Amino acid sequence: CECFEHNPYYKETIQNATRMLKSGGMFLFTCATTGRPVHGTKSLEEEGKRKFSNWKTMPNVIKENWDNEYYKNLTENDIRECLDFDNEFETYHFEIEENHHDLFFWGIKK
């Protein structure tokens, strides 16, 4: 999964994904974190097209009646507030990829 920064219900999504994960299953995701420029909002796409002749919109962003302007770079603390990771996962790890400002997570469910 690489989209939680666009999901206003990321907490509920993480809780539900963890709930549905079988014991021994792996939960793996990345998301934008501090330092990543806002991307993938309709207004930003329109602005980019006006400012840059070489602007390319990813196909998944082109949708009729798309009005999602929600965007939030997520931190490890934001994710940790979603659930008790020590209670849910046998082992897990957070890592930040500094070049692209991505937060990585993997965990094995108890």
What are these regions (language model features)?
Residues 1-8:
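A short SAM/SAH-binding and catalytic strip from SAM-dependent methyltransferases
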